[in-house]
A protein has these predicted regions:
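Active-site-proximal helix-loop-helix substrate-binding element of RNase H-like nuclease domains
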Residues: 2-5, 35-193, 201-205, 437, ...
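N-terminal accessory regions of nucleic-acid-interacting proteins
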Residues: 1-29, 37
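Conserved "right-hand" nucleotidyltransferase catalytic core of DNA-directed polymerases
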Residues: 1-5, 38, 182-392, 400, ...
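C-terminal structured "cap/appendage" subdomains that terminate the fold
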Residues: 567-619
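Short hydrophobic beta-strand that contains or immediately precedes a catalytic carboxylate
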Residues: 25-27, 105-106, 278, 407-411
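Short active-site oxyanion
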Residues: 77-82, 101, 272-275, 404-408
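Conserved catalytic core of nucleic-acid polymerases
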Residues: 216, 348, 352-353, 358, ...
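Short, contiguous acidic/charged loop-to-helix segments that flank catalytic cores in large enzymes
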Residues: 340-346, 357-359, 372-373, 378-381, ...
C-alpha cells in the first residue's frame, strides 16, 4: 500500500487528477462522532477497487486541513461504483457535506449479512467466561479476519479524530481499512454467485441510498405539541399515583400504613427508608401481600411479579391492583414522550432514527435510533427507536411534515396473512382475499360456527388475535398471554378451545407447521424466501416457529425492499423518504406534488408485492396527511 496523506489544495488537485481516471472507487470515512448531523468528516479515504494491484495507492484526504473541497462532489457523484463497508453510515456524512451518490454500490457489510444471516460461532462471555453460540459478527475487523486471515486492531476507531494534528497511527489505520476492501469484495462476489445470492445482494444494495436518506432527513417534530403531551401525561401520572396510593393506604392495616410527610400527606418518592415508591415492584408486592391481594406469578421463577406482561394477562377485579395497572401504562407513555424530546437533534431540530436494512436475519429492517458516543469513556448509546413510538393519535400527531410539504403514508393491508395464504397455499384464505372478505371475521365465523355477517365485534377481535398469533405455530399457553396483551383476557381452557378451533378451520396451516417442524428435526436448516434470501437456523434458532416466520416475514421484507429500491429513482427534494415502520412507508412530498407522488408510492408498493403474490390480491392504502396520525 502506498499512502498519500493530503492536507493542501495543491495536493488535493493532484489527487483529483489521478482519481478521475479511476471509475470505481473504494470509500471510507473517519468522523469526529457517530451523528452525521452533529459531527464532521475528518478523513476521507479513496482508492481503486481492483483487487489484484501489486501496490494500491490510497488517498487520505484531511477535510479539516483541506477546507476547500471544491471538486470532491463532482468526483464522487460521477463514479460508476463505490465500494465500502457499512456505507449507510458514510453516505449520511457525505449527504451532510452536499454529496448524494446515486449509482452502483458494493457494500461488504451487507454482502456479508446476505452470506452469513443466521450463522453462529463460539463466543466467550467476558463477564462469566461461559462459552455460548452467538451471531457471527459482520464488523470490518471480523470480516477481514474471516475472509483474509488478517488480524487488525480497531483501537484507533475511538481515538480523537477532532484534534488539530492526527497521529501517524490514525492515518495508517484509516488507509489500511480501505486498502483491504477490494480483496474482501472479490471473495464475497465469488461466494454470492456460488450460493445463488447475487440477486438478493443486488436488491439490498439498491436500498442503501434510500435508507441513508431516510436517516438523513428524519422526522419533523412539533416540539410545542410534544411538550404539551408531556405535561398532560405528567398530570395523568400524578393523578393516577395519588389514586393508587390512597387506595392502597386505606386498605393497609394499622402499623403498616404508607410513610407520611410532616403535614400528614403520603410521602411518595425513591428514598426507600422514608418514602413509598409506586414504581418499585418490591415495595408494591409487599404491600399487596399485606392487604391480601392475589398477584400474578412468574412461571420461570415461581415468584410473584408485577411486570407489565404479567399484569396485562392477569384477570383481577381488585380495584387497587387495577389502579396500579393504569398507573404503569401512563408511566410508560410518559417515558416515551420524554425520549422523543431527548432525541430531537440540536442541529436539525428533527428526530433522526438509525435504520439497519438487514437488521433481522429474516431480512427485515430494524430501527435502533441514532447512534452516538457520549461521556468521557466514549460510551455508545442509541436514541429513540421510531418503531416503538406508540401508535396512539396523541403521539403520532406530534410528527409533522416540513413546511411546504405533506406526508404521504402508505402501508400494506394484512400483508403477512396474504403471504401466508399464497406461500402456504391455504385455500380458505386465498378464497376470502379474492372475494374481498374480512379475514378476521371469517376466522371468527369458522370458530364460532356463525355466518360471517353475524360475527360480533368481540368475536372479530378474537379472530384477529388468532390469525396473527397462530400463523407461526404459537401454542395455546402462549396464545393466552398474547390474547391478554391484546386486551382480551381469557382462561387457559378458552385458549385451548380457540387454538383447536383455529386449526380445524385451517387444516393446511397445521399441516404446514408439521412440515416446518420436520425441516428443523436435525437441529439446523436453511430457509429461503421466494426471492432467494437465505437464513440459517441452528442451535436455539432451529424451531418450527422460526422456520415458519422466516419464510413469511422474509418475503415481506423482500416486498418492502423491492418497493424502496424501485422508489429510489423518484427520490429528490420534492419527494423524500422519512421513515419505515414494519410494513409502512412515510415520505414527504411538496404540497403541489403530493397527489402525484401518492399515486407513484401506491403503484410501486403494489407492483413490488405482485412479484410474490400471484393468487392473492394486493391491498396497499396510501394517503396525503398533515401528520403521522392521519394514516
Amino acid at each position: 500500500m502506498k499512502l498519500h496523506y493530503i492536507t493542501t489544495r495543491e495536493g488535493l488537485e493532484k489527487a483529483f487528477a489521478e482519481l478521475w481516471t479511476i471509475p470505481k472507487l473504494c470509500l471510507d470515512t473517519e468522523t469526529t462522532g457517530l451523528d452525521a448531523r452533529v459531527n464532521d468528516v475528518r478523513l476521507l479515504q479513496l482508492c481503486s477497487t481492483q483487487a489484484d494491484l501489486e501496490e494500491r495507492v490510497v488517498y487520505v484526504i484531511d477535510c479539516f486541513k483541506c477546507s476547500d473541497l471544491d471538486g470532491l462532489k463532482s468526483l464522487i457523484e460521477s463514479r460508476e461504483m463505490i465500494l465500502g463497508h457499512n456505507l449507510n453510515f458514510d453516505l449520511q456524512f457525505l449527504l451532510q457535506i452536499g454529496i448524494d451518490y446515486k449509482h452502483k454500490i458494493f457494500d461488504t457489510f451487507i454482502a456479508e449479512r446476505c452470506l452469513v444471516a443466521g450463522s453462529k460461532e463460539k463466543k466467550t462471555s467476558p463477564k462469566t467466561e461461559k462459552v455460548f453460540f452467538g451471531e457471527i459478527s459482520c464488523s470490518l475487523k471480523a470480516v477481514v479476519e474471516r475472509r483474509l486471515d488478517i488480524k487488525i486492531s480497531k483501537e484507533q476507531q475511538v481515538s480523537d479524530w477532532s484534534k488539530s494534528e492526527l497521529d501517524i497511527e490514525q492515518i495508517e489505520y484509516a488507509a489500511r481499512d480501505v486498502d483491504l476492501l477490494p480483496q474482501i469484495a472479490k471473495a464475497q462476489l465469488a461466494e454470492l454467485a456460488t450460493e445463488n445470492l447475487v440477486e438478493v445482494y443486488s436488491l439490498e444494495s439498491k436500498v442503501i441510498r434510500p435508507v441513508a436518506l431516510m436517516c438523513h432527513h428524519g422526522f419533523n417534530v412539533d416540539i410545542t405539541k410534544v411538550k404539551q403531551l408531556k405535561a398532560k401525561k405528567q398530570q395523568e401520572l400524578n393523578e393516577a399515583t395519588n389514586l393508587f396510593c390512597e387506595s392502597l393506604d386505606a386498605r393497609l392495616p394499622d402499623g403498616f400504613r404508607l410513610p407520611r410527610h410532616e403535614d400528614g400527606t403520603i410521602a411518595v418518592g425513591k428514598n426507600a427508608k422514608k418514602e413509598f415508591n409506586p414504581g418499585s415492584n418490591i415495595q408494591c408486592i409487599k404491600h399487596f401481600n399485606q392487604i391480601g391481594t392475589d398477584l400474578p406469578v412468574d412461571d420461570r421463577t415461581g415468584k410473584q411479579t408485577l411486570s407489565q406482561v404479567a399484569l396485562s394477562e392477569f384477570d383481577s377485579d381488585d380495584l387497587t391492583l387495577n389502579l396500579l395497572r393504569k398507573r404503569t401504562k401512563i408511566e410508560t407513555a410518559l417515558a416515551h414522550v420524554e425520549k422523543i424530546l431527548e432525541n430531537i437533534n440540536p442541529i436539525s431540530g428533527r428526530m433522526h432514527s438509525g435504520y439497519n436494512s438487514y437488521g433481522a436475519n429474516s431480512g427485515r429492517f430494524t430501527s435502533s435510533g441514532s447512534k452516538r458516543v457520549t461521556g468521557k469513556k466514549k460510551k455508545e448509546t442509541w436514541g429513540i427507536n421510531i418503531q416503538q413510538v406508540p401508535r396512539d393519535k396523541e403521539f403520532r400527531e406530534c410528527f409533522i411534515p416540513s413546511e411546504g410539504y405533506k406526508f404521504i403514508i402508505a402501508d400494506y393491508s394484512q400483508i403477512e396473512l396474504r403471504l401466508a395464504a399464497e406461500l402456504v397455499n391455504i385455500p380458505q384464505m386465498i378464497d376470502a382475499f379474492n372475494k374481498g372478505l374480512d379475514l378476521h371475521s371469517l376466522t371468527a365465523s369458522l370458530i364460532y360456527h356463525v355466518g360471517i355477517d353475524e360475527v360480533k365485534k368481540p368475536q372479530r377481535q378474537m379472530g384477529k388475535t388468532l390469525n396473527f398469533a397462530l400463523l407461526y405455530g404459537m401454542g395455546f399457553r402462549k396464545y393466552k398471554t398474547y390474547s391478554a396483551q391484546s386486551g382480551n383476557i381469557i382462561t387457559l381452557s378458552e385458549a385451548k378451545t380457540a387454538h383447536a378451533g383455529f386449526h380445524r378451520a385451517y387444516p393446511r396451516l397445521r399441516e404446514w407447521h408439521r412440515e416446518r417442524s420436520a425441516m428443523v428435526e436435525d437441529g439446523w436448516t436453511y430457509v429461503r424466501t421466494p426471492t432467494g434470501r437465505r437464513r440459517l437456523l441452528s442451535y436455539d434458532d432451529a424451531t418450527m416457529s422460526a422456520c415458519a416466520n422466516t419464510l413469511i416475514q422474509g418475503a415481506g421484507a423482500d416486498i418492502l425492499k423491492i418497493a424502496i429500491a424501485n422508489l429510489g429513482k423518484h427520490i429528490n427534494e420534492k419527494f423524500r423518504p422519512i421513515a419505515t415502520v414494519h410494513d409502512e412507508l412515510v415520505f414527504e412530498a411538496l404540497e403541489e406534488k403530493a397527489n402525484e407522488y401518492k399515486t407513484i408510492l401506491e403503484t410501486e408498493m403494489k407492483e413490488a408485492a405482485m412479484t410474490i403474490l400471484n393468487n392473492v390480491p394486493v391491498k396497499c392504502d396510501a394517503n396525503v396527511a398533515e401528520s403521522w396520525a392521519e394514516k
